[in-house]
Amino acid sequence: MDMLSLNQLQLNIEKRNLFDLCITFLPSAITYIKGANGSGKSSLLRMIAGIMQPSSGNIYYKNSHINNCIKPYCTYIGHNLGLKLEMTVFENLKFWSEIYNSTETVPAAIHYFKLDYLLDEKCYNLSSGIQKIVAIARLIVCQSDLWLLDEVESNLSKENKDLLNNLIVMKANSGGIILLSSHQENVIKSAQILQLK
């Protein structure tokens, strides 16, 4: 089964244990990660994405340790959006699609987020909210079944928040696993909550 398992996953900072997690996320799960600033929400997502090492414990996805998973096995969007600012919107989408071998998905991402009129714009010319939408369009382009989203709803208009939340629900309905950290209220009522101390 395509589940995500955290096995005694710990993060220790300055002799303080931020969390010690044993939890499994099943396909179609949407999970809000909640907690105060400094509780380890961003670090947890970075660990699952393979960007940061835990202090101890293991992470398994699709029954394989993430160190053994074929990369890229997830789509991670953090505070650093991963945009190539000197490239155009279209060039960024094409770049990601080539990494994930999914070039056929670019038109769907452009259409869903109404990016047609921005395709030739350099990303450094875009507002922070539009830059974020271009980054979020990667969710459609990359076609992975594991989404890790770190406060992606900030700086978005209500319309774009609705588009994002609808996309998350559609991904869950098709068997995806979505983890998102958020300081905002839980808009997706079917989601579960993982509370970090």
From Swiss-Prot:
ATP binds at G35, A36, N37, G38, S39, G40, K41, S42. It is found in: Cell inner membrane. Its main location: membrane. One of its GO terms (molecular function) is ATP hydrolysis activity. Belongs to the ABC transporter superfamily. CcmA exporter (TC 3.A.1.107) family. Part of the ABC transporter complex CcmAB involved in the biogenesis of c-type cytochromes; once thought to export heme, this seems not to be the case, but its exact role is uncertain. Responsible for energy coupling to the transport system. This is Cytochrome c biogenesis ATP-binding export protein CcmA. It comes from Rickettsia prowazekii (strain Madrid E). The lineage of its organism: Bacteria, Pseudomonadati, Pseudomonadota, Alphaproteobacteria, Rickettsiales. The gene is ccmA.
